[in-house]
């Protein structure tokens, strides 16, 4: 099975080896071929998204499914919330059973904050976590991607 995954940028693409490793340990003999399709900052919208999905599903080497992964914070006001983003992507693509829109409630990079101690070790810095009890609170005003970028720029 081939699954094309539309992603917004370099962080998401860099995540794929770890995702493949995680899935291969759990999908014994049923591991799909994950094909990341990377864009610069946000995946296409409206008619362009529909054309891309159609091409991926019916091209020379067609995918069996297409997953679109987007953030709420795309640098625009295209989406008001996660449900709005999923609904709009589904509407733009149309009635395609093997298209699966998925939305990171905040930045994709926020998913990385779960491993804050490991991030600090990798950056070789000591810094307390930039949120209180709820990591989602840090999105407003300064997204996780910017915080992570600053952390690695100020390293040792």
Label each PLM-derived region with a short phrase:
Residues 2, 13-39, 50-156:
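C-terminal accessory helical subdomains adjacent to catalytic cores in phosphodiester-
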């Amino acid at each position: 099975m081939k699954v094309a995954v539309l992603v917004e940028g370099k962080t998401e693409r860099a995540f794929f080896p770890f995702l493949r490793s995680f899935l291969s340990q759990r999908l014994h003999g049923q591991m799909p071929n994950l094909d990341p399709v990377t864009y610069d900052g946000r995946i296409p919208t409206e008619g362009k998204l529909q054309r891309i999905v159609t091409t991926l599903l019916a091209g020379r080497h067609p995918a069996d499914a297409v997953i679109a992964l987007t953030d709420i914070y795309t640098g625009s006001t295209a989406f008001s919330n996660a449900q709005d983003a999923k609904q709009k992507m589904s509407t733009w693509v149309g009635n395609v059973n093997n298209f699966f829109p998925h939305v990171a409630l905040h930045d994709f990079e926020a998913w990385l904050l779960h491993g804050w101690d490991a991030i600090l070790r990798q950056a070789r810095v000591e810094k307390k976590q930039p949120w209180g009890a709820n990591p989602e609170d840090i999105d407003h005003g300064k997204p996780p991607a910017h915080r992570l970028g600053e952390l690695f720029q100020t390293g040792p």
